């Protein structure tokens, strides 16, 4: 049996209606590499500059976590006192019935327990597909989905599973470990020294090992990290 190897992406591509940001995981937290406005006169060219900067920072390979904008996510808090994980899952699915324009079968949702309550974050599958298609088109090598909600909306980091592209981007046996702490920008990344060269970005092989990947300093409650409910 192939041994499972946990990994965390070395970049985050944050998508919003205001623009696109690329963050780099460092020992000091998430550093902003750059951002591009959606109304840019040449969006593709500016995104290419971001991508080339990323490959200069991590010559071994670029793999990214896609942050879905909050406007595309439905957050709920439900009473789950005394429930086990299976019962919380069922309660979340019931609460989502009619809460979005989509049938529950067309949603991906994550549930985090917080005392007598559970926090639910749900997103449409088609939203994830569109986000992945965009990231793949611009060669940001997306491997998983998450969100960065306001603290009052969700406890922890919503995780929406791995991308379709992940199987081709990850090494055999690698699995993406969900983020345990909120994804926040701790600083601005200095530009790499020297010219930025467009390296071969088709076969990323390097990632940031889980054991040596401090994330943002913002603490969160010690809640179990649940796998997303793919229903």
Regions of interest found by a model, annotated:
Residues 1-231:
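Hydrophobic/aromatic-enriched cytosolic interaction surfaces used to assemble or bind macromolecules
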